[in-house]
Amino acid sequence: MADAVGEVLEGSWNQDLADALDSAVCDLNSDQDGVIQVRDLSPPQRAKLWMIALNVSGKGDSLSSWDGVLDLPEQTLIHSRSQQLIDELGIPVEEGRDLVSDVESVITFYCKSRNVTFTPDLSWPHILKPLLGLQLSRKDLYNCFYAIMNKYIPRDCIVKGRPFHLFRLLLQYHEPEFCSFLDTKKITPDSYAINWLGSLFSSHCLPEVTQALWDVYLQQADPFLIFFLMLIILVNAKDNILIQEGDNKEEIIKMLEQSPSLLEAEDIEDLFSLAQYYNSKTPLSLRKENHNLFGSSLVALKEEDMDLSQALCLPVSVPEILQANQLQPEGVRFFVVDCRPAEQYNAGHLSTAFHLDSDLMLHNPSELALSVKSLLEAQKQSLESGSVASGEHLCFMGSGREEEDMYMNMVLAHFLQKNKEFVSIAKGGFMALQQHLADINVEGPDNVYVHWIVSTSGSHSSLSSADGELNSTDGKGVKSLVNKMTFALKSKSVNVKEKVISFIENTSTPVERHVSSSDRVGKPYRGVKPVFSIGDEEEYDTDEIDSSSISDDDRKEIVNIQTWINKPDVKHHIPCNEVKETGHMFPSHLLITATHMYCLREIAARKGFAYIQSRQALNSVVKITSKKKHPELITFKFGNNNAAGVEIVAVERYLIPNAGDATKVIKQQIMKVLDALESS
């Protein structure tokens, strides 16, 4: 189709364009290569092109059911912005009066039909501005506006909104050095790109540039393409920004925000070519995991899945990892780095994965440095040899259990600090891989997925279950294999997990009780000194167990935050952020009573309410530590004394402003509890 319409003779331009538009009605949404090459379009021609691309050509009058009453609380603001928009276009008074009415009606009806409020910071007038140049009827103006809002403007396009966290991860993936520079300056994408995204660049581009850009963009029918266009804008601005290192934050933000204004109409073709190139170098998970940003989908995400603000790097799904290296060389191919301990890796791992024991990060840094060097050399050699395991894109895989992936996250942070591009993390880790192979539910030894998992241990006995060996070919297939691996990897922790659950149940006593002998957890043996201490977090216990490893969904209770803060037995209230091993943070509150420490995690969807995330007896606190470089990051370790020594049963980490004061009051309360126990 592109060949048929790309080159036209000047004399028959109008007719050829009309024919091309007519024939393109069914093709624009399915054939991304079928972009009609346009130039010097008249308003009616451009209107026809855009309406076909937006799939509103011939659509009925949505406004016909409306009574036309302009009575919203923010109506004065809507009228003012509508008048301002027409004034900017320099339209004669008579014609302008009708257009003001059209714009005000479109915005008002959209607000009423979608039950939203118009605010001064919205980019809607910028979206309407290019549409007004098409001389559309009020009906078509609304239909085009609605289609653009619905298909191309992402949800949560607000300050600190999810699209901007996603864009930061995309920037980090391709331009880690520039991303790090902006992070250092505390310049977030929403500070410079909120109007880019909210108006498809019309807020900052010249009218003729916006028209040329939309001519192509609307035909591409790809809402995620805006992120790659934004990326190219930043890549082009990077050199000028980096030399402004001495400038203050506001000046840099202003320079970034104005970058699209430098575009000219003849730049558009190159802009899209580069955007498509970067798109081809980006994991598809960016789209698939965030597809509900656009369109009419009202699919709700889990609270934790929605928060991209604290993600270390771009997450990639296990199915994409498995499929990617079967693609042609020009696609995204992953060099998978398995960061689990050697014991787990040897028990079973992705056949194409390179092993990097992240525990070495703390236990043997020099050996880790050699391993990293070997990793990069292996990646280089695999690329040169065209190995099935080769990939330009590094994807780190952990176990999928937060408490075990702490060191992997540190290794990952190390690579990011070195400005290594194309760095991602396998979403859900090795556990997600096991689950995916089980979910495909294909039985039999000939299943093509069987080769994905291999064991490098000398004996398979540790992986045996009641139905045979790991490498048996008795027809059990993938499910059997996965079940055995899951059994082997989890069996060792069953007893510990049961102990921890019992421990939490036994310490979840009502806060109204006073300290008594029944409150003791792990009463010290005769002659054994209390093990509670406060120190710097340089020494890690290798057997520590994060409390998040226990499924506590059934125990979570929803409470009113203020009601709990005001309880008479709450002695101290400490606002904080709970920090998970994945790097995610959740606004929380620590409440200290005479005997316990409670963590209330705020519920984003229910303001003023929180989950009771954890209850810990103060006399079970073994150690409170902090990082030298980040004194506000506090780690609490909880445990028991027994004949073998101290058994760590839970670890919790919090980011606490004025951490020194907070730990002081907690320590004082702990000492009171210990003194009471000693004297009882």
Swiss-Prot record:
Compartment list: Golgi apparatus, trans-Golgi network; Cytoplasmic vesicle
Keywords carried by this UniProt record: Cytoplasmic vesicle, Developmental protein, Golgi apparatus
GO cellular component: cytoplasmic vesicle; cytosol; trans-Golgi network
Chief location bin: Golgi
Highest classification ranks of the organism: Eukaryota, Metazoa, Chordata, Craniata, Vertebrata
Domain called Rhodanese: residue spans: 330-442
Disruption phenotype: Morpholino knockdown of the protein causes reduced brain and eye size and curved tails at 48 hpf.
Name of the featured protein: TBC1 domain family member 23
Species this protein is from: Danio rerio
InterPro entries listed in its UniProt record: Rab-GAP-TBC_dom, Rab-GAP_TBC_sf, Rhodanese-like_dom, Rhodanese-like_dom_sf, TBC1D23, TBC1D23_C
UniProt GO BP: brain development; embryonic brain development; retrograde transport, endosome to Golgi; vesicle tethering to Golgi
This protein's record includes keyword Cell wall biogenesis/degradation: no
PROSITE patterns tied to this protein: RHODANESE_3 (PS50206), TBC_RABGAP (PS50086)
